[in-house]
Amino acid sequence: MMVPVRCFSCGTVVGEHWEAFKARAETHDGDEDPADVLDDLGVDRHCCRRMLIAHQDLVDVVSPYQ
């Protein structure tokens, strides 16, 4: 749904990295490897990395039904 603000496991703020991660790693051109993007953003913990990699942004799909 919405981007999580904090990691569910350790509580580190991860929401601030979503826009940069999305712009660099999730383009259809396949510009950069997601692991390299997360390294550049300083997201080191595995639990925090999975929060960004596994997130599906569905807020635009769900919002008409509210």
From Swiss-Prot:
Assembly and binders: Part of the RNA polymerase complex.
Highest rank taxon of the organism: Archaea
InterPro entries, per database record: RNA_pol_su_RPB10, RNA_pol_suN_Zn-BS, RPABC5/Rpb10
Gene Ontology molecular function: any one: zinc ion binding
Cell location: Cytoplasm
SUPFAM superfamilies hit by this protein: RNA polymerase subunit RPB10 (SSF46924)
GO BP: DNA-templated transcription
Protein family: Belongs to the archaeal Rpo10/eukaryotic RPB10 RNA polymerase subunit family.
PANTHER family associated with the record: DNA-DIRECTED RNA POLYMERASES I, II, AND III SUBUNIT RPABC5, DNA-DIRECTED RNA POLYMERASES I, II, AND III SUBUNIT RPABC5 FAMILY MEMBER
Organism this protein belongs to: Halobacterium salinarum (strain ATCC 700922 / JCM 11081 / NRC-1) (Halobacterium halobium)
Binding positions (Zn(2+)): 7, 10, 47-48
Annotated keywords: Cytoplasm, DNA-directed RNA polymerase, Metal-binding, Nucleotidyltransferase, Transcription, Transferase, Zinc
Entries under Pfam families matching the protein: RNA_pol_N
Protein name, as recorded: DNA-directed RNA polymerase subunit Rpo10
Cofactor(s) this protein requires: Zn(2+)
Cofactor note: Binds 1 zinc ion.
GO cellular component, one term: cytoplasm
EC numbers, comma separated: 2.7.7.6
Catalyzed chemical reaction(s): RNA(n) + a ribonucleoside 5'-triphosphate = RNA(n+1) + diphosphate
